[in-house]
């Protein structure tokens, strides 16, 4: 086995598909989490022969999957501080995060917002911790009227900008996010996320053109 030369590998990342709580779960309110197992239980079991062959049933208890497999299976926990996507992706590439990305449960500081608004020639409304679908329903009408972009965050280190495609096209939205990314580095914010949506009042829908602007890894 060890004499075999691996010419290439396929690294598949299924973001947020957890297989059980990590040792630091209590620090993030994640006690008892197990996305894969809980989803399988909710739907009454899953039929995933390829996942089963890879060994997913060996990693955690998944209704519908067995322990028989043909692959080499392992289950790892992060050494990094943090539980967001960027931290995990960096560690997959060998970079350990020793300083957790900054979160802003009470909104972002005005000096950061002012810098972005000035350079990007835009205005923001919102600046709250919120669900993405709920905030476009709550502020969507105001956004359509004023053309001010919707700014919000979550429990992770994210600076999210939502805009209706008729108010701010993708090219403009991405450009604004690039400006935001530059200033968010100074605040140790992991990701700036473009959140375009479409539709009418009472029937807004986020599109598939989301784009994440991550902090460049150090080193």
What is the meaning of each model-derived region?
Residues 6-10:
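Extreme N-terminal starter segment of soluble prokaryotic enzymes
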Residues 1-5:
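Short, Lys/Arg-enriched N-terminal segments with co-localized hydrophobic residues
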Residues 16-164:
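Active-site nucleophile/metal-coordination loop of metallo-enzymes that catalyze phosphate/sulfate
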Residues 133-218:
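Active-site pocket-lining segments that scaffold enzyme catalytic pockets across diverse folds
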Residues 13:
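Generic enzyme active-site microenvironment
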């Amino acid at each position: 086995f060890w004499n075999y030369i691996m010419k290439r590998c396929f690294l598949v990342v299924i973001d947020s598909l957890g297989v059980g709580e990590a040792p630091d779960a209590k620090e993030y309110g994640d006690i008892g989490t197990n996305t894969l197992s809980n989803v399988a239980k909710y739907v009454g079991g899953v039929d995933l022969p390829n996942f089963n062959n890879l060994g997913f049933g060996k990693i955690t208890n998944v209704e519908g999957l067995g322990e028989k497999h043909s692959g080499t299976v392992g289950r790892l926990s992060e050494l990094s501080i943090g539980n967001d996507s960027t931290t995990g992706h960096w560690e997959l590439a060998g970079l350990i995060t020793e300083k957790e990305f900054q979160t802003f449960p009470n909104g972002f500081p005005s000096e950061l917002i002012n810098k972005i608004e000035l350079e990007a020639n835009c205005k923001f409304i919102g600046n709250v911790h919120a669900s993405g679908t709920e905030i476009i329903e709550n502020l969507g009408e105001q956004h359509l009227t004023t053309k001010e972009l919707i700014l919000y965050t979550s429990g992770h280190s994210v600076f999210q900008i939502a805009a209706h495609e008729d108010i701010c096209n993708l090219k403009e939205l991405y450009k604004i996010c690039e400006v935001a990314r530059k200033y968010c580095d100074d605040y140790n914010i992991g990701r700036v996320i473009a959140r375009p949506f479409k539709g009418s009042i009472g029937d807004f829908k986020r599109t598939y053109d989301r784009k994440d602007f991550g902090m460049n890894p150090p080193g």
